[in-house]
C-alpha cells in the first residue's frame, strides 16, 4: 500500500474526528469564496450596466442616489430637471451624446422609463418580437417582466404613479405593448420602455393648453443631441428626470462636472466614482465577513492539529512497528503530513463546492439577474493555496513528533 492510500485509510479510520475537521475547514473556505464570488459578480454587473455612461446629470441631491436611480433603477430620483436646461447643457462642446430619462411611474412594481431608442442601443438590446416604442403611448417590455406577468404584444398597461404596487393609477392613459425585448442580462430586462413624450402625456391629464396669442408654441423643435422632437411649449414647460452623458474628450471629465455643479438646480454624478464609493462602504462589511471566514479556517486548522496529535498518541505502537519493519523516519513524517493535507484538500473541496453551488442557486433565484452563477474567479487560486498552506502548517508539528519518536522506548513500554 502506497503512502497516499495509507493516509486516506487512516483518515477514514476516525470518521467523526475527520468529519469535524472537514466541516470546519469547508465552512471557512466557503465563507471566503462566497464573499469573493459576490463582490466580483456585483462589480461585473455594475460595470455592465454602467457601460458607455460617463456622467449622469439629475436634480440637486445625492450623487449616489442619482446613479442608483438612473443607471440601476433601485432608488428614487432626486427630482426633475427642466427640458430647457437639459437641452442647453447638451449643446456644450464637451458632450458627445446624451440620453434623456423620465422616471417615476411603474406597472405592477416594475419601473416605466421614458427615453429614446438610444437607451436600448446603449446595451445593444434586441427585440424578441414586435417593434420599439414610439411617441404615441406605446411600450416595449423587458424580457423578465414579459415572462413573469405574461405580457404579450397588443396588451394594455395602466401605469401607476410612483414606484410601488398599489399606487394611484393613470387608467385614462394606458400604454399599448408593441414589442418584447430579448433577455440581455442588463437592467433592461426589468424595465418598461416608453417615449419621453408618452410620459408627459400621462401626466398632462385632460388639460388642453390654449395659446391663441402664441400659436407658434405648437411648432416642432428638433433637439438633435437628445434625440427628441418637441413643441416649443414642451421645451419651455416640460421636465425630465436625468441625462446619461457620453464625453466627447477626456478633458470633459474634469470640466463638465464642475460646469454642471455650478448651476443652481443640476447635479453631476460620476458612475465610476460613486460605484467605487459604494464598494468602499460595502467593503467594511466584506472585510468583517472575510475575517470570520479566516478565523473559522484557523479553528479548523487547530482541529486538524488536535486530530493528528490524538491519532499520533493512539498509533504510536503502530508507527513504531512500521519503523521496526523498515519504514524510514522520513516515511513516517510524510505519512502524518499527508494525512493532514488529505483532510485539508477534502475540506477545501467541500468549501469550494458549497460556495459555488450556493451562489449559483442564489443567482438563479434572483429574477432581475440573467447571468449564470457558475463562474470562477482567479483569486480563488489564492484561497486554495492559502488553505493548503494552513493545512500543511497544522500538520508539520505532529509529523515532526512522529519523525522524532524513539521506537525502542515505545516498544519497550508495549
Say what each PLM segment does.
Residues 1-34, 44, 337:
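N-terminal Sec/SRP start-transfer signal
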Residues 11, 323-330, 405, 414:
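Short helix-to-coil transition segments within interhelical loops
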Residues 23, 287-307:
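Internal alpha-helical transmembrane segments of multipass membrane proteins
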Residues 36-111, 118-121, 135, 232-233, ...:
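Hydrophobic, regular-secondary-structure patches
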Residues 106-116, 126-210:
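Hydrophobic secondary-structure segments that place a key small or acidic residue at a functional site
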Residues 171-172, 180-286:
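Mechanotransmission and gating elements of multispan inner-membrane complexes involved in transport
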Residues 296-299, 309, 316-362, 386-390, ...:
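Transmembrane alpha-helical interface segments in multi-pass membrane proteins
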Residues 354, 366-400, 409-414:
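Conserved transmembrane alpha-helices of multi-pass membrane proteins
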